[in-house]
Amino acid sequence: MRATEGEPTIPVDSAAPVPTKRSVCEEILASGYVQSFVDFFYLTHRQDPKATAGIVAGAASSKDNNDIVVSAEEMKFMKENLTRAEESRRKGDTDNVYNSYSNLAVYFQRGQVNDPKTGVYFYEKCLEIAKLTSDGPGEMSANHSLGCVHQQMGNSAAAIRFHERHMELARASGSYREMEGAARELVKVSC
């Protein structure tokens, strides 16, 4: 299983001018990273998942009040990982593509952002890359992560499906460590 060392850190550069969503979008697009632009635009021009939960509870009523707020550091982190993934894909460096998407998935799933649905989006990209390249350890890790995030969201059926796939891959590879990890998660989600 690929290990992610905690939550990725976001470096702070206090001397740089504060970018806007628009300026970063333009910079990404002008640099020729079309897919990165699309993903960045979506990530920075959507409703705040926390505010959306507030709508259900009746706490917010205005669309403008629900727009996600993204700091300069977060924009830099997203831009760097998205463009690195796209550039690496062009070069055929699938390990770096996987790692960049994994960084984004972990970032959105954990910490203050706490947006597991966006984490799922990037873990699914990891799974896609792993399948395309026959990366068994990467596929096991992505299935494990998708199972865990679906568990976190309360979607037991999906969690079980991903953990069972993780178990199948672990058995096929003969990795007892992976089988143990998949079994542990299956027990957690089943109880």
Identify the function of each model-found stretch.
Residues 1-191:
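Intrinsically disordered, low-complexity regions
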